[in-house]
Amino acid sequence: MRNLMKITKALSDENRIRVLLALRGGELCACQITELFGLAASTMSKHLSILYQAGLVDSRKDGRWIYFRLPDGKAPSTIKKAIDWISKAA
Protein backbone atom coordinates (compact mmCIF):
# COMPACT_ATOMS: atom_id res chain seq x y z
CA MET A 1 0.00 0.00 0.00
CA ARG A 2 2.88 2.36 0.79
CA ASN A 3 4.28 2.02 -2.75
CA LEU A 4 0.88 2.84 -4.21
CA MET A 5 0.71 6.00 -2.10
CA LYS A 6 4.18 7.08 -3.25
CA ILE A 7 3.27 6.53 -6.90
CA THR A 8 -0.06 8.36 -6.68
CA LYS A 9 1.59 11.27 -4.85
CA ALA A 10 4.27 11.46 -7.53
CA LEU A 11 1.66 11.46 -10.29
CA SER A 12 -0.47 14.14 -8.63
CA ASP A 13 1.60 17.05 -9.94
CA GLU A 14 1.61 18.31 -13.53
CA ASN A 15 5.33 19.15 -13.48
CA ARG A 16 6.25 15.62 -12.41
CA ILE A 17 4.09 14.18 -15.20
CA ARG A 18 5.85 16.50 -17.65
CA VAL A 19 9.26 15.31 -16.38
CA LEU A 20 8.27 11.69 -17.03
CA LEU A 21 7.14 12.60 -20.53
CA ALA A 22 10.40 14.47 -21.19
CA LEU A 23 12.42 11.46 -20.06
CA ARG A 24 10.76 9.27 -22.70
CA GLY A 25 13.32 10.80 -25.07
CA GLY A 26 16.21 9.54 -22.95
CA GLU A 27 18.38 10.48 -20.03
CA LEU A 28 18.61 14.13 -18.99
CA CYS A 29 20.80 15.96 -16.50
CA ALA A 30 18.97 17.58 -13.59
CA CYS A 31 20.22 20.94 -14.86
CA GLN A 32 18.70 20.26 -18.30
CA ILE A 33 15.36 19.34 -16.75
CA THR A 34 15.42 22.47 -14.59
CA GLU A 35 16.18 24.66 -17.61
CA LEU A 36 13.55 22.92 -19.73
CA PHE A 37 10.80 23.69 -17.23
CA GLY A 38 12.02 27.09 -16.08
CA LEU A 39 11.59 26.26 -12.40
CA ALA A 40 13.92 27.02 -9.52
CA ALA A 41 16.58 24.36 -9.01
CA SER A 42 15.30 23.65 -5.50
CA THR A 43 11.75 23.15 -6.78
CA MET A 44 12.87 20.76 -9.51
CA SER A 45 15.10 18.92 -7.04
CA LYS A 46 12.04 18.26 -4.86
CA HIS A 47 10.02 17.02 -7.85
CA LEU A 48 12.85 14.71 -8.96
CA SER A 49 13.25 13.40 -5.41
CA ILE A 50 9.56 12.50 -5.21
CA LEU A 51 9.72 10.73 -8.59
CA TYR A 52 12.86 8.86 -7.50
CA GLN A 53 11.38 7.78 -4.16
CA ALA A 54 8.31 6.45 -5.98
CA GLY A 55 10.53 4.42 -8.31
CA LEU A 56 9.33 6.31 -11.39
CA VAL A 57 12.84 7.47 -12.34
CA ASP A 58 16.37 6.16 -11.93
CA SER A 59 19.42 8.35 -11.48
CA ARG A 60 23.17 8.19 -11.79
CA LYS A 61 25.87 10.59 -10.72
CA ASP A 62 28.69 11.59 -13.06
CA GLY A 63 31.07 13.94 -11.28
CA ARG A 64 28.95 16.77 -9.97
CA TRP A 65 26.07 16.09 -12.37
CA ILE A 66 23.06 13.87 -11.69
CA TYR A 67 21.31 12.29 -14.66
CA PHE A 68 17.75 10.99 -14.59
CA ARG A 69 16.07 8.41 -16.82
CA LEU A 70 13.01 6.21 -16.84
CA PRO A 71 13.55 2.91 -15.03
CA ASP A 72 15.11 0.06 -16.98
CA GLY A 73 13.69 -3.42 -17.48
CA LYS A 74 14.27 -4.33 -13.82
CA ALA A 75 11.57 -1.95 -12.60
CA PRO A 76 8.50 -3.52 -10.96
CA SER A 77 5.54 -4.05 -13.27
CA THR A 78 3.52 -1.46 -11.32
CA ILE A 79 6.05 1.22 -12.25
CA LYS A 80 6.13 0.15 -15.90
CA LYS A 81 2.33 0.21 -16.06
CA ALA A 82 2.16 3.69 -14.50
CA ILE A 83 4.66 5.08 -17.01
CA ASP A 84 2.89 3.36 -19.92
CA TRP A 85 -0.43 4.78 -18.76
CA ILE A 86 1.00 8.31 -18.60
CA SER A 87 2.53 7.98 -22.06
CA LYS A 88 -0.75 6.82 -23.58
CA ALA A 89 -2.80 9.49 -21.83
CA ALA A 90 -0.52 12.35 -22.92
Question: For the regions a protein language model found, what residue spans apply to each?
Answer:
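N-terminal helix-turn-helix DNA-binding core of bacterial DNA-binding proteins
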Residues: 2-42, 65-74
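Conserved segment of winged-helix/HTH DNA-binding domains
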Residues: 3, 69-90
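Conserved phosphate-binding and hydrolysis motifs of nucleotide-dependent enzymes
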Residues: 16, 47, 55, 63
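Alpha-helical residues within the helix-turn-helix
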Residues: 35, 46, 52-53
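Beta-hairpin "wing" of winged helix-turn-helix
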Residues: 53-62, 69-70
